[in-house]
Swiss-Prot record:
Protein name: Sugar fermentation stimulation protein homolog
Gene3D superfamilies xrefs: 2.40.50.580, 3.40.1350.60
Natural source organism: Aeromonas hydrophila subsp. hydrophila (strain ATCC 7966 / DSM 30187 / BCRC 13018 / CCUG 14551 / JCM 1027 / KCTC 2358 / NCIMB 9240 / NCTC 8049)
Lineage: superkingdom: Bacteria
Similarity remark: Belongs to the SfsA family.
Family matches, as PANTHER family: SUGAR FERMENTATION STIMULATION PROTEIN A
Amino acid sequence: MIFDPPLQSGQLVSRYKRFLTDVQLDNGEVITIHCANTGAMTGCAEPGTRVWYSTSSNPKRKLPHSWEIAESPAGHFICVNTARANQLARELIEQDALAPLRGYARLRTEVKYGEENSRIDLLLEDDHRPACYIEVKSVTLLDEREQAGMGYFPDAVTTRGAKHLRELMAMKAAGHRAVLLFMVLHSGIVRMRPAAHIDPHYSLLIEQAITAGVEILCYRPHVGVQSMVAQDFIPFESCHLLPEGSE
């Protein structure tokens, strides 16, 4: 994924009303840009943070600019535009860059499914194997106190994410393949686990999903201000495998 036209940069002034962000440009001008991320954005949205934003050519947009990248105090690049996770996952699957998801004849997006009025992010289909239902989640939360690059999901309580896990378990029970794909969009994260300290219910549901046969994949693309490209999978640490008292 190449950012075209190239991203422009500035300094974060404030994020407010969830979707709005004020950015000061190098010439001193302050502009308001759109923020697609509705999460807590812990460690990504401190005033003074260096940010990069894209510009839409759509004249009907009220806010033509969108916040794409933040640079952490440690120099890590973080893609904060949650829509990019789905876009990049689709690109990588179409490029056969994600080995566990290769070999399907068709890929569809936003297909209605399940019993809770859901739409699956990605649906892989083939005439010779069960369909593969993929929910994509964007991971940007790094615990800066840890030196081992531990990332967490979610960064806030997520009832929507819980619904998606229930739907995936139902698809698996119906004989399909079900995958929870974490797209790790923080260059400082090298492994991850459920954020039981933030959303214990979601963490419990992940354990139930694993037991039910839902696959957990964590993929970390290379995140930069010019592009995001294929890199590697990273380990996922299930909470029930952690030593007692480690949370």
